[in-house]
Swiss-Prot record:
Name of the protein in its database record: DNA-directed RNA polymerase subunit beta
One cellular component (GO) term of this entry: DNA-directed RNA polymerase complex
Entry-linked PANTHER family: DNA-DIRECTED RNA POLYMERASE I SUBUNIT 2
Entry function: DNA-dependent RNA polymerase catalyzes the transcription of DNA into RNA using the four ribonucleoside triphosphates as substrates.
Pfam families associated with the record: RNA_pol_Rpb2_1, RNA_pol_Rpb2_2, RNA_pol_Rpb2_3, RNA_pol_Rpb2_45, RNA_pol_Rpb2_6, RNA_pol_Rpb2_7
Oligomer and partners: The RNAP catalytic core consists of 2 alpha, 1 beta, 1 beta' and 1 omega subunit. When a sigma factor is associated with the core the holoenzyme is formed, which can initiate transcription.
Lineage: Bacteria, Bacillati, Bacillota, Bacilli, Lactobacillales
Enzyme class: transferase
GO molecular function terms listed in the Swiss-Prot or TrEMBL record: DNA binding; DNA-directed RNA polymerase activity; ribonucleoside binding
Gene that specifies this protein: rpoB
EC number of the protein: 2.7.7.6
Record's keyword annotation contains Nucleotidyltransferase: yes
Protein family: Belongs to the RNA polymerase beta chain family.
Keywords: DNA-directed RNA polymerase, Nucleotidyltransferase, Transcription, Transferase
GO terms (BP aspect): DNA-templated transcription
Length: 1188
């Protein structure tokens, strides 16, 4: 027997074909959401408060300090929040201290700071009753970046940019004349020496002393001449910078100093964030810049005076490591004191080294480092600016390297916590202005924190973020996999990110640093390709928001692969060589071969085993969860795998789902972490179990109660239904499944079914990927799903009186009211069809249209039907089904309703949708198709043992698409069915062709895995043997019931009077310009005329035509289309005297819209009236015949 048995949870064993020992379990798959939010609660929120506070008033006599905060219990439980359309949020109370500096008086007070949405255990938020997800954003990391560009003459120039988290950009660039310029905040450029002089180093010699002598420096100094001798060089430089930043304003050195300080050196206005400081220190660090350079001076220890490194030594990694302590200490540190006119007058500490130029051995190049400012310094320092300039000048000398902006070391993730902190900061900053004004205006003695704090800006910022940010998305709830994928999604779009139109190929492309961090496969097709990605299965965020991936460390001394796990970011990995997970190892962990396949930076090649630093932990660490669910992924073309991964997320939960015979072993973990199942929180014993709740007695005697959700409507309209897995007496451990969620079976993800599939053509019905299906799949409800639709009706107060929910609906027969209760609301369990009343509702209508006689009769007989209009909630087109639930919300019951609403009724209708022609099906390899015919079981081809085939697919769908994985799955699936086992074939480590054939033999199948197939209609065998097997097929969310739509008459657009478009508006089919050409080509003038008139916007014509058709009379000639009248009116509005004349030169009168017509209704009413009139006439005729 090939393979070995592996247990997945307590309910499933699979035969696995994996050969690689996994040394690390998958992390919790939604930790990117939950950990980030937890960090926000633990420290992020506190940091935001500490950033903005304390706040002082303008005279500095009062100060408001932050003390701490506390979350109280949420107002609603999760379930109550869903039912009441509320948010699941907890009130936050913040303690402030108000200090009066004149009297020394301190007032401490707790202030309510609004309700803050809380993340559920599943990593989602409930906002206004809907489940939402905050998608993590992929953005450019703050830091310093260097780039090169080639001009039109082929000359290489360099550029550099310091990008903060918030604040002004500082750029450097060279031009074609070899002069270096700087730009502050995207303004006009100035020589870079001008900025150096503004920092207090004004002499030319001083500048050359700092940066060393080079052509770029000399050229720039020559360009930067002293124009105004009355000013010092520093003052002149400051004025020049001020002129660039504030053109047209009077320039003084003092205003320039304060402006530059505010732009770069004030921590409140300029923030690099922790990650920006880390990146700058890493880039400008002397150690990395000296690596592999030849030192041009003796390095002398300042304390002992000994020579650490002699001039002429190559600074290899080992040399640098030997003097690492001194490099981090005071080695070659110089203190430069700026002059008194400088922006920042504190001394500047720089680390300076001289190295031999790599281009010209006779030249010496100076390298200036920023002497590693402390991590807490979040603003820029003069040392940073000088070190950046030095790196930039060194690039022209052939030292240092330019940055690749698409490298994942330069892109980071802003997860939920950080996005929320940023929103909160925005709200607090708005509040700060408000607080400062109130502190200054009001009387100091009576002020309390409560009085001066207005929380509205903060709550508004948070509310706006959750409600309308591009990154706050309605959860994709088609199935557990789509939930999981959505929580792990990384978007480069959104505020502060890219835009679809500006993103080029480079940003979207797969980069070598994606390995183990972002999935190269799973991304949407279309305009967002490559901008929306998914976290790889082992991906994890570090404290700076860079994605790390785990590797097994290699002990290079003994050449053994250890089980020690090291998590590396992309730029850390660049320094090492990493071997693949399938490298052959001896039992003691040493490499079995001298040469192994590995990766170093962007190169995939063979390396000597002795050079390898790390080994991948798992073959599936490259791909995301959805991709890791595709068996035989290694045999599929990547474009089809992309479709396969995306289509699994569109699978509809079926009534009786089955886990795949051929899985990848990922199904258990995906189901477990998705949040859709019920998982045991503690060890214990089941003491009660039914379909709605399970009780578990813990070992310490306390009782855990788990509620099972039955048939709740999911965000996408499918049934969210959980099924209990345990029975009384079962022992459960923490993490065990208590109940399966939707699309799960026995604790594994089960998106579809395992039908018997044959690759063969049949009467041409599977042309172009169409799917032929057996009637068995319809009759036995194999692909049947339940869909729940929600309809609501509310009663409001109108000008003419309140609306009313009632059973007494005017002009409706008793038959239409048979399923309504005494209130006029449909009973639960009623079967409803299109047009049936769900909630009877009447709205008062004005009496302006009554004549005097009618009013008199009305007053005498009290005819109620005249006063009200029927506005009942009816079942829309395609909405028929069974009423599953009715919820009634009223103020009397204490429900919160919108202002003006007195009562709200929600009706849930369940539909059982069997698979039918036009539904979309797919396998897991991107092989998708539409059901084209459902064939009776007796007509389907059958196997030699009489088993009829379930599905027939076109064999032509395989070769050109190169997704051979489906054929391998087919054969292995048949073997698994015959053997009665389930199989796991993990990606890149699954069943080989030898394993496949061995399992086929074991299952007693023919040696070519094909079979003779008999025609169900004739009983004759087909000419050739056919590939028949079991393939996992899923039914997708694109169902024909949602798309098919037909209209006779319906709503019309107000201005053009043409039918609306689309199913949602019950619209017509657009007969466009090209379709008109087709009719013109055949001279079909009558058809063309009716399309442009009756069927479109000839208002009177269509009314008359309708009447003529219903009465059986000939159809009258058409009139003038409304859009022609609109054209005439538009031309008249331009002041043109436009008239329409007939052939006798008489003016044609166009009907006017405002001739007593009700123009606030789309003109369905005219047709409705005609219809009612017709019905009335028919009824009168029927009655008169009865009387006779």
């Amino acid at each position: 027997m090939a393979g070995h048995d592996v247990q997945y949870g307590k309910h499933r064993t699979r035969r696995s074909f994996s050969r690689i020992k996994e040394v690390l379990d998958l992390p919790n798959l939604i930790e990117i959401q939950t950990d980030s939010f937890q960090d926000f609660l633990d420290s992020g929120l506190k940091e935001v408060f500490e950033d903005v506070l304390p706040i002082s008033n303008f005279t500095d006599t009062m100060e408001l300090e932050f003390v701490g905060y506390e979350f109280k219990e949420p107002k609603y439980t999760l379930e109550e929040a869903r039912i009441h359309d509320a948010s699941y949020s907890a009130p936050i109370f913040v303690t402030f201290r108000l200090i009066n500096k004149e009297t020394g008086e301190i007032k401490t007070q707790e202030v309510f700071f609004g309700d803050f949405p809380i993340m559920t255990e599943m990593g989602t938020f409930i906002i206004n009753g809907g489940e939402r997800i905050i998608v993590s954003q992929l953005v450019r990391s703050p830091g310093v970046y260097f780039n090169d560009k080639v001009d039109k003459n082929g000359k290489v120039g360099y550029g550099s940019t310091v990008i903060p988290n918030r604040g002004a950009w500082l750029e450097l660039e060279t031009d074609s004349k070899d002069i270096a310029y700087t730009r502050i905040d995207r303004t006009r450029k100035i020589p870079f020496t001008t900025l150096v002089r503004a920092l207090g180093f004004s002499g030319d010699d001083e500048i050359i002393d700092i940066f060393g002598d080079s052509e770029l420096v000399r050229n720039t100094i020559e360009k930067d001449i002293h124009k105004n001798q009355s000013d010092s060089r520093t003052d002149e430089a400051l004025k020049e910078i001020y002129e660039r930043l504030r053109p047209g304003e009077p320039k003084t050195a003092d205003s320039s100093r304060s402006l530059l300080t505010a732009r770069f050196f004030d921590a409140r206005r300029y923030d690099l964030a922790a990650v920006g400081r880390y990146k700058i220190n890493k880039k400008l660090n002397i150690k990395t810049r000296l690596l592999n350079q030849i030192i041009a001076e003796n390095l002398i220890d300042s304390e002992t005076g000994e020579i650490l490194v002699e001039a002429g030594t190559e600074m290899t990694r080992s040399v640098i490591e030997s003097i690492e302590e001194q490099l981090d200490g005071d080695l070659n540190k110089f203190v430069y004191t700026p002059n008194d006119y400088a922006v920042v007058t504190e001394p500047v500490i720089l680390q300076k080294f001289k190295v031999v130029s790599p281009v010209d051995p006779d030249r010496v190049v100076t390298i200036v480092g920023n002497a590693n400012p402390d991590d807490k310094v979040r603003a820029l320092t003069p040392a940073d600016i000088l070190a950046e300039m030095s790196y930039f000048l060194n690039l022209a000398e052939g030292l240092g390297k330019v940055d690749d902006i698409d490298h994942l070391g330069n892109r980071r993730i802003r997860a939920v916590g950080e996005l929320l902190a940023n929103q909160f900061r925005i709200g607090l900053a708005r509040m700060e202005r408000n607080v400062r004004e109130r502190m200054s205006v009001q009387d100091n003695d009576v002020l309390t924190p409560q009085q001066i704090i207005n929380i509205r800006p903060v709550t508004a910022a948070v509310k706006e973020f959750f409600g309308s940010s591009q990154l706050s998305q309605f959860m994709d709830q088609h199935n557990p996999l789509s939930e999981l994928s959505h929580k792990r999604r990384l978007s480069a779009l959104g505020p502060g990110g890219l835009t679809r139109d500006r993103a080029g190929y480079e940003v979207r492309d797969v980069h070598y640093t994606h390995y183990g961090r972002m999935c190269p496969i799973e991304t949407p097709e279309g305009p967002n390709i490559g901008l929306i990605n998914n976290l790889s299965s082992f991906g994890h965020l570090n404290k700076y928001g860079f994605i790390q991936t785990p590797y097994r460390k290699v002990d290079r001394v003994i050449g053994r692969v250890t089980n020690e796990i090291v998590w590396l970011t992309a730029d850390e990995e660049d320094e090492f060589t990493v071997a693949q997970a399938n490298s052959k190892l001896n039992p003691d962990g040493t490499f079995a071969e001298e040469i192994v396949m590995g990766r170093h930076q962007g190169n995939n090649q063979e390396f000597p085993a002795s050079q390898v630093d790390f080994v991948d932990v798992s073959p599936k660490q490259v791909v995301a969860v959805a991709t890791a669910c595709i068996p035989f992924l290694e045999n599929d073309d990547s474009n089809r795998a992309l479709m396969g991964a995306n289509m699994q997320r569109q699978a509809v939960p079926l009534i009786d789902p089955k886990a795949p015979y051929v899985g990848t072993g990922m199904e258990y973990q995906a189901a477990h972490d998705s949040g859709a199942a019920v998982i045991a929180q503690h060890n214990g014993k089941v003491v009660f179990s039914d379909a709605e709740r399970v009780e578990v007695r813990r070992e310490d005697g306390s009782l855990d109660v788990y509620h099972i959700t039955k048939f709740r409507r999911s965000n996408s309209g499918t049934a969210y239904n959980q099924r209990t897995l345990v029975k009384i007496g079962d022992i459960v451990e923490k993490g065990d499944f208590i109940a399966d969620g939707p699309s799960m079976e026995k604790g594994e993800m089960a998106l579809g079914q395992n039908p018997i599939v044959a690759y063969m053509t049949w009467e041409g019905y599977n042309f172009e990927d169409a799917v032929i299906m057996s009637e068995r799949l319809v009759k036995e409800d194999v692909y049947t799903s339940v869909h729940l639709e929600e309809f609501e009706s509310e009663t409001r107060d109108t000008k003419l009186g309140p609306e009313e929910i009632t059973r007494e609906v005017p002009n409706v027969g008793e038959e239409a009211l048979k399923d309504l209760d005494e209130m006029g609301i449909i009973r639960i369990g009623a079967e409803v069809k299109e047009g049936d009343i769900l909630v009877g509702k009447v709205t008062p209508k004005g009496e302006k249209d009554l004549s005097a006689e009618e009013r008199l009769l009305h007053a005498i007989f009290g005819d109620k039907s005249r006063e009200v209009r029927d506005t009942s909630l009816r079942v829309p087109h395609g909405g028929d089904g069974i009423v599953r639930d009715v919820k009634i919300f009223t103020r009397a019951n204490g429900d919160e309703l919108q202002s003006g609403v007195n009562m709200l009724v929600r009706v849930y209708i369940a539909q059982k949708r069997k698979i039918k022609v036009g539904d979309k099906m797919a396998g897991r390899h991107g092989n998708k198709g539409v059901v084209s015919r459902i064939v009776p079981v007796e007509d389907m081809p059958y196997l030699p043992d009489g088993t009829p085939v379930d599905i027939m697919l076109n064999p032509l769908g395989v070769p050109s698409r190169m997704n051979i994985g489906q054929v391998m799955e087919l054969h292995l699936g048949m073997a698994a069915r015959n053997l009665g086992i389930h199989i796991a074939t993990p990606v890149f480590d699954g069943a080989t062709s030898e394993d496949l054939w061995e399992t086929v033999r074991e299952a007693g199948m023919d040696s070519d895995a094909k079979t003779v197939l008999y025609d169900g209609r004739t009983g004759e065998p087909f000419d050739n043997r056919v590939s028949v097997g079991v393939m996992y097929m899923i039914k997708l969310h694109h169902m024909v019931d949602d798309k098919l739509h037909a209209r006779s008459v319906g709503p019309y657009s107000l201005v053009t009077q043409q039918p609306l478009g689309g199913k949602a508006q019950f619209g017509g089919q657009r007969f466009g310009e090209m379709e008109v050409w087709a009719l013109e080509a055949y001279g079909a003038s009558n058809v063309l005329q009716e399309i442009l008139t009756y069927k479109s916007d000839d208002v009177n014509g269509r009314l008359k035509a309708y009447e003529a058709i219903t009465k059986g009379k000939p159809i009258p000639k058409p009139g003038v289309p409304e859009s022609f009248r609109v054209l005439v009116k538009e031309l008249q509005s331009l002041g043109l005297d436009m008239r329409v004349l007939d052939e006798d030169d008489n003016e044609v009168e166009l009907r006017d819209l405002d001739e007593g017509e009700d123009d606030d209704v789309m003109h369905v009413d005219d047709l409705e009236k005609a219809r009612e009139k017709q019905a009335q006439e028919t009824q009168d005729i029927a009655e008169s015949t009865e009387d006779n």
